[in-house]
Amino acid sequence: MKFKAKISKASILLKTVQNIMKIYNECICHITPDKLRFIIQSDFNDGMQVFCEIQRSLIFENFTIESLSDNEIQFQLDLESLRRVLQSATSNGVSDIFTNLTKVRGGPVLHFIIKSGTSGTVIFQDIPIVLLTAQQMAQINEPTLPDPLVHILLPNLKNLQKVIDKMKNISDCLKIMIAMNNRLSFEVETSSGSISTFYSGLDHPQFGDHVLSPDLQATVCVDIKKFAKVLHIHQLKPSEVVLCLYERSIIVHVVLTDIMITYYLPVLIKN
């Protein structure tokens, strides 16, 4: 088993890690000849999942990977440890960042070599990892779902985050309504009333050949704090963010150049 590469876009990788680790710190990293994937499946009670896929050519140069499993390698790692390494690697004066898979005192680690272009300093850092077999990786699958009940392109995420941050101080439950006539609303309720915000004129991307009626709409309730965590992705300046509602979950698809991130959040079931 062999993996080594030069990290050419450490700042992009850092921003991605900083955002997805808001969901959960433990992560599965899956490296293939074409892609780098981060998979987060938080504890059973939380129910959130994140699947992040980055085109290998965006992040790595001088890339080598070899394994008995179709040249794919997968392992568990701590995202905070990776964040700290990337943070130091993106500081002023750093010119080259290399990484490779190796062993330290008999245990597998992700080894980093950080070279400073100004002082000539070389820093070595290791992140302990837990290697996974191909059989274990085969059990980790992204959920397969039918077409959503309704879906819509979200408005400016930075502004939306400010709205949701104010709402989360009022209630734990966020009511989301999507109408297929370009409307979206968010609502929180209190014992004395409710607070809502409305958006109109939003687009509906098409899923497959099925065209939904403009009269169709759906409403679900989700944990507002979990939804607020997803909105931090605005820091990556995505080109498109699609919100999909299902009976038991919502999905947020985040599209960037050569990066796709999908968040799965469970719907709150009221008794």
From Swiss-Prot:
Coiled coil: none annotated. It is found in: Nucleus; Cytoplasm. GO terms for biological process: cell division; DNA damage checkpoint signaling; DNA replication checkpoint signaling; double-strand break repair via homologous recombination; meiotic DNA integrity checkpoint signaling; mitotic DNA replication checkpoint signaling; mitotic intra-S DNA damage checkpoint signaling; nucleotide-excision repair. It holds the Pfam family Hus1. One of its GO terms (cellular component) is checkpoint clamp complex. InterPro entries: Cell_cycle_HUS1, DNA_clamp_sf, Hus1/Mec3. Essential in controlling the S-M checkpoint that couples mitosis to the completion of DNA replication. It is also required for the response to DNA damage. PANTHER family: CHECKPOINT PROTEIN, MITOTIC AND DNA DAMAGE CHECKPOINT PROTEIN HUS1. This is Checkpoint protein hus1 homolog. It comes from Dictyostelium discoideum (Social amoeba). The lineage of its organism: Eukaryota, Amoebozoa, Evosea, Eumycetozoa, Dictyostelia.
